Amino acid sequence: LIKDVRGFTRDSDQEILVGSWTSYEVDMKEHLSERIPTVLSFVLIVTMVLVWFQVKSVVVPIKAVLMNILSVTASFGLIVVVFQEGLLSDALNFTPQPLDVMVPPLLFGIAFGLSMDYEVLMLSRIHESWLETEDNTRAVAEGLQASGRLITGAAAIMIAVFSGFIFADVLIIKSIGFALAVAVFVDATIVRAIVVPSCLLYTSDAADEGLGVD
């Protein structure tokens, strides 16, 4: 309707503006749709370049980005099921409705940053172990052991903080808190503890060179 009204008044001699919260959301959605590909490309490329400077490997930065995206997409899926489909609407005391247009960009930025923080911490420990042993399997095991407690503790703190927002009355705050808690939980318990070590061992021939460069 808003697009129809704007199209109908476009040829008018007078400047006619269409207001209201709905028109704001329409404009914001179009603006985000135009900018998101550029922002995503910038974030992913810069992330891979910085990780490459750390480990001097082509495979490891790509793996790092993919693992982070895995955590973020898991939270995206659950937030849709819970808040749009209403899976936990009674338990969390809210009425199911479409997600606010600002939720996905905010969620991606925060969750991706936290995931990369844990990734860099783990890669640093693995890299240090490789320099001492030059054994990829042992380096992954020792790196996971050295960083595991720190990552788990940091994740537990963040989950506790984000979970507090779930009890908010404002739906956008509730949904962001839930999604971030899920993203951190998935990242710390599944991605960092299982998927990342498995990928490093599976791609050991390609990653081995990078993990051992000064």
State each model region's role:
Residues 38, 42, 63, 100, ...:
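Alpha-helical transmembrane segments of multi-pass inner-membrane proteins
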Residues 1-89:
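Structured non-transmembrane domains adjacent to transmembrane bundles in polytopic membrane proteins
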Residues 130-152:
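Helix-loop junctions and hydrophobic alpha-helical segments within the transmembrane domains
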Residues 40-51, 67, 71, 104-111, ...:
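Alpha-helical transmembrane segments of integral membrane proteins
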Residues 202-208:
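Conserved small/polar residues in nucleotide/adenosyl-binding loops
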Residues 50, 148-201:
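Hydrophobic, glycine/alanine-rich multi-pass transmembrane helices and their short helix-loop junctions
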Residues 109-129, 151:
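Short helical (or helix-break) motifs at transmembrane helix termini and adjacent helical loops
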Residues 57-66, 86-107, 167-181:
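Membrane-water interface of transmembrane alpha-helices in multipass transporters/channels
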